[in-house]
Amino acid sequence: MTVVCWSSRLLLLLPYLLLCVFGPSASHAGRLLVFPMDGSHWLSMLGVIQQLQQKGHEVVVIAPEASIHIKEGSFYTLRKFPVPFQKENVTATLVELGRTAFNQDSFLLRVVKIYMKVKRDSSMLLAGCSHLLHNAEFMASLEESHFDALLTDPFLPCGSIVAQYLTVPTVYFLNKLPCSLDSEATQCPVPLSYVPKSLSFNSDRMNFLQRVKNVLLAVSENFMCRVVYSPYGSLATEILQKEVTVQDLLSPASIWLMRSDFVKDYPRPIMPNMVFIGGINCLQKKPLSQEFEAYVNASGEHGIVVFSLGSMVSEIPEKKAMEIAEALGRIPQTVLWRYTGTRPSNLAKNTILVKWLPQNDLLGHPKTRAFITHSGSHGIYEGICNGVPMVMMPLFGDQMDNAKRMETRGAGVTLNVLEMTADDLENALKTVINNKSYKENIMRLSSLHKDRPIEPLDLAVFWVEYVMRHKGAPHLRPAAHDLTWYQYHSLDVIGFLLAIVLTVVFIVFKCCAYGCRKCFGGKGRVKKSHKSKTH
């Protein structure tokens, strides 16, 4: 009886077993083309690529031969294309950018120098993009590969041109774009009354003068963006054989994976194809190496301070480095300072210089008391994920805005790296370490950030696969993309209704005037004629 019973059960299970063995896999293996941007942008994308490869997808990465960080990997195929510049040129550009942050020229001279540098650097990158797109053999090989989707960082829209040339759906992986290009390309509303512009140093609670400043910045910001991005429109027009603007390049993206969230950023409108994956770089913490474990253990009850200004800053002017070293020597904590420049002569015993440090792993250690950072988005999120209060020294780009957001939330103190003194840095460190409110605020942000139904990495992987499976996501694209500017703002409707109202008012006015003439004009003429007869 028992044997018969088990046989019956096996017969019932057999169809399901066959379905599992021979049926279609849950995740359709596809081919993904990746066109990343070098530097930290690439490093944050690596986790997504690795997960996709583990799910059976074939990943091909294309990059210039002059790339610094993009190298061969075990979970992707790297294909490099020639460009008209060398790796040394890219390195020199990054070093110069780091030095620019410590330039103490007058404001006007700094603006001119920054403008010239942006123009020079963007010309170099544009030349690399043009070299790729005119490489007929390389582009033909990409076309023959029949990719299911392209994953790229739209900060430089070369990947967008490649996607349109290959006619493949695109997934963007970014923090944000300058000049609100991301909002324009997604048709996302940006109310200037409570959404601060980049470099405005405003929060989302603005007074009248701050709102005036916000509007003026919105009007003027397109000048710099025209220098960087307009040439890509001309290049795309040549390659695609049709008139193309930068917005035309960016707007077809299926999904925008935004490396942000509303724990760091202020609440604002979003669109259906904008997916927030802030904190994706907060990977699983690893045990510290013996070297760093020894540093942490030797710090005693006071703990450690982690100090890094990012990979772009390799050297600091001697005077400023000595001011920083003096301030660090005044606190009881052990300071691990990632620095590759000349060793300051006044470096204290509690300060250890290292060429590299496992930043996320150190921030996750319970003995870490504070984090000195340049406020890059990666560092900010690692500070949030690990609940470490911050002393922020923003240098360029979106770092000023990141620092303002953390300061507004009471999670850190911001210093002007050009104007700060040793006393300022000492006081800032002692404030975030000894004032419990900073630790409480950053822990609250950390708790909010981690309270989510799905990890950012898994969410990013899901949406890339989604686009690969469905050949895009056109159902998430708003009809606003197909409207003219006057249709979008309903100016034609307003004009039509206004014309009707004015016409009705005009007709009513004419009718009233006619009625008045009939009622009062006739009597006046009769009386006048009667008087003339009596005389």
From Swiss-Prot:
Specify the superkingdom. Answer: Eukaryota
Q: Which residues does the record list as glycosylated?
A: 89, 297, 435
The GO cellular component terms are:
endoplasmic reticulum chaperone complex; endoplasmic reticulum membrane; plasma membrane
Q: Which interval of the chain is the signal sequence?
A: 1-29
Transmembrane intervals: 493-509
Question: SUPFAM superfamilies, per this entry?
Answer: UDP-Glycosyltransferase/glycogen phosphorylase
**Oligomer status and interactors:** Homodimers. Homooligomer. Interacts with UGT1A3, UGT1A4, UGT1A6, UGT1A7, UGT1A8, UGT1A9 and UGT1A10 to form heterodimers.
The protein depicted here goes by the name UDP-glucuronosyltransferase 1A1
Which species does this protein come from?
Answer: Mus musculus (Mouse)
